[in-house]
Amino acid sequence: MINLRKTHPLMKIINHSFIDLLAPSNISAWWNFGSLLGICLVIQILTGLFLAMHYTSDTLTAFSSVAHICRDVNYGWLIRNLHANGASMFFMCLFLHVGRGIYYGSHLYKETRNIGVILLLTVMATAFVGYVLPWGQMSFWGATVITNLLSAIAYIGTTLAEWIWGGFAVDKATLTRFFAFHFILPFIITALVIVHLLFLHETGSNNSSGINPDSDKIPFHPYYTIKDTLGLMFLLLILLSLALFSPDLLGDPDNFSPANPLNTPPHIKPEWYFLFAYAILRSIPNKLGGVLALLASILILLIIPFLHTANQRSMMFRPVSQTLFWILTANLMTLTWIGGQPVEQPFIIIGQLASILYFTLILVLMPLAGMFENYMLEPKW
């Protein structure tokens, strides 16, 4: 069996990736989120597959088919709740994974980071088209508002929006194609995950101290498989608690009403994991400017490595950068809160200040902090 694991063409790849892989001996629980994201992806694909067996992507029957899944299909309510709350867990792990990368300097592995940002954008696209499928009020109006942002693009905007819609507004054609996108994108994500791992295993994992760990490495199995299993237990505990006790906690009450193009909800908002970007979009009183700020809020992750001015890789021994990082975290939480509030004072000005602070922290203050820390570490005699 040992020989087969090391000689079989397929088993050999799995062996080098998950069993005999050498990993730094000092990586903390913050390195669990990669494997948890893999588990989340598997859960989402499996639950999504069973939901797709009963769902109909037609404007007349979509809402009813979701109700049918919850009422008439064996454990349909559980599958639907796991899928809906699994998306929230997916994004929670994603945000923690990205935050870990920034804090410990893992983003300096540029190829891994680039694929990671593409993965983040693809997952966000998948979640957006998936949110439209139940065809509730917030599904319909969320799709209308977000796809309408394409019309802000000069010359081709309106044509592009109508091309995405398959008509002059969000309707049956839009729902059908969004279902097709939502079905195919997770498999594209799976392919990107494999590429992400391929690039990661070219360099090996970073570690919390940020120094080269080659002198002290241990095999992935059994040490990190057990550690990841503990993380998985916590993930399943939270996911099952959400799905079984408060399945609608993170949803929107408006989505219990079927889509009605003649009745606009008082406050249109996306799912909680998009609220920070939605707050940045709304903070600029110009359509094109808002769209550009929305894109910049995510794509800024691509330039973070070029803004890394510190001589040390990790923030573990950089107190000024640490402080700014946690201010950035608090700022993102503030933006998430603002995104869920109505467009009125004082929320407008708080959102604008938080948006300015978000970009200032990443583009100006954190690079300056790195330079300052370099200066403080230089011998002065």
Curated annotation (Swiss-Prot):
User: What would be one Gene Ontology cellular-component term for the protein?
Assistant: mitochondrial inner membrane
Q: Which residues of the sequence carry a binding annotation for heme b b566?
A: 97, 196
Chloroplast as UniProt keyword: no
Keyword Mitochondrion on this protein? yes
Q: Cofactors per UniProt?
A: heme b
**GO terms, molecular function:** metal ion binding; ubiquinol-cytochrome-c reductase activity
Membrane topology of the entry: Multi-pass membrane protein
Transmembrane spans:
33-53, 77-98, 113-133, 178-198, 226-246, 288-308, 320-340, 347-367
Note the PROSITE patterns from the entry: CYTB_CTER, CYTB_NTER
Additional comment: Heme 1 (or BL or b562) is low-potential and absorbs at about 562 nm, and heme 2 (or BH or b566) is high-potential and absorbs at about 566 nm.
**Its function?**
Component of the ubiquinol-cytochrome c reductase complex (complex III or cytochrome b-c1 complex) that is part of the mitochondrial respiratory chain. The b-c1 complex mediates electron transfer from ubiquinol to cytochrome c. Contributes to the generation of a proton gradient across the mitochondrial membrane that is then used for ATP synthesis.
Provide the protein name: Cytochrome b
Q: Which organism is it from?
A: Sminthopsis psammophila (Sandhill dunnart)
